[in-house]
Amino acid sequence: ITLILLITCTFTLTGCRNQTTDSGFKENVEIAWDDVKDDFDQIDQDVENDTSKQDVKALTQTILDGYDKIKEGITQDNQEEAKKVYEAASRLEYIEKNTDQKLSSEEKEILELGKKTKTLMMYYYGNGEGVFQDAVDDVENGIDRVKNFTEEKWNDFKDKLE
C-alpha cells in the first residue's frame, strides 16, 4: 500500500507540470511560479521604490528582444532573459498605473504591454488564468504597436512622461 501511494504521489506531482491546461498552454512548465515568485515579487517591490525616470522606449525594446527568446516557454537556459523581460514589463505597468498625463490610445497601448507581458509570463510559469492564446495575441499585438511607433511619436511620448 505504501508503494502504491508513493507511486501515485510521484506521478501526480511530476505529471502536473506536463499537462495541457484548460487555458490552452501546451508547453511543459520547467520552472514553476512558486520557484520564482519571491524573486519576481522583489522585482515589483524594487520598481515601486525606484523613483528614477524610465525610458519607455528602452523598456519596450527589452520586451521585444526578450520575447523571441522566451515565447516557447521559460527554461533554465533563458531564465535570466525572462527576469529582464519581467522587470521591463513591471516598470511599464508601474508607469501606466502612476502617470497622470493625458495619453493617446497608442501611448496607453504601449504602457499596457507591461501588464500584458506579465500576464503571458504567468502561463510560462504554470500560473496563467484565462485563455493562453488571448494572452499571446495581446502581447504580439502590443509588440506590433511598438514596432510601428515612429521616432517622432517616441519623442513626444518621452516629453509627456518627463
Predicted feature descriptions by range:
Residues 1-15:
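Sec-dependent bacterial lipoprotein signal peptides
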Residues 12-14, 65, 152:
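Serine/threonine-rich, low-complexity intrinsically disordered segments
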Residues 17-25, 88, 156, 160:
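Low-complexity, polar/amphipathic intrinsically disordered segments that mediate membrane, lipid-surface
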Residues 36, 40-51, 105-162:
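C-terminal amphipathic alpha-helix
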Residues 64, 68, 72, 94-95, ...:
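Polar/charged low-complexity regions in secreted precursors and cytosolic/nuclear IDRs
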